[in-house]
Amino acid sequence: NECIRKWLSCVDRKNDCCEGLECYKRRHSFEVCVPIPGFCLVKWKQCDGRERDCCPGLECWKRSGNKSSVCAPIT
C-alpha cells in the first residue's frame, strides 16, 4: 500500500500518511495528510511531490532515468 501524499484524503487510513505527515481533520471538511510542524526530510529521503520539505541545506534532486527524486546536499 503506497503512502498518502500531502493534502490528500486519509479518511479510514489515518496511519497511512507519508513520512512527516499526519492525518488531520480540517474544520468543515474531511481528513487530509498535512505536514507535521518542524518536520523535514533528511538526506537521501524521497521527495517526489514534496520539493519544499527537505531539511535546511538540502534540495530535492531529480535523479536521471526513472528514479525518484531525493533530498541531496545543495551544491
Swiss-Prot record:
Tissue: Expressed by the venom gland.
Superkingdom classification of source: Eukaryota
Domain repeats: from-to residues: 3-33, 40-71
Swiss-Prot/TrEMBL keywords: Disulfide bond, Ion channel impairing toxin, Proton-gated sodium channel impairing toxin, Repeat, Secreted, Toxin
Region named 2 X approximate repeats with cysteine pattern C-C-CC-C-C: 3-71
Disulfide cross-links: 3-18, 10-23, 17-33, 40-55, 47-60, 54-71
Subcellular location: Secreted
Function: This toxin potently and selectively inhibits ASIC1a, an isoform of the gene ASIC1. It incompletely inhibits ASIC1a activation in a pH-independent and slowly reversible manner. This toxin acts by binding to and stabilizing the closed state of the channel, thereby impeding the transition into a conducting state. In vivo, this toxin protects the brain from neuronal injury when administered up to 8 hours after stroke onset.
Sequence similarity: Belongs to the psalmotoxin-1 family. Double-knot toxin subfamily.
Domain notes for this protein: The presence of a 'disulfide through disulfide knot' structurally defines this protein as a knottin. This toxin contains 2 'disulfide through disulfide knots' that are separated by a short linker.
Protein name per Swiss-Prot or TrEMBL: Pi-hexatoxin-Hi1b
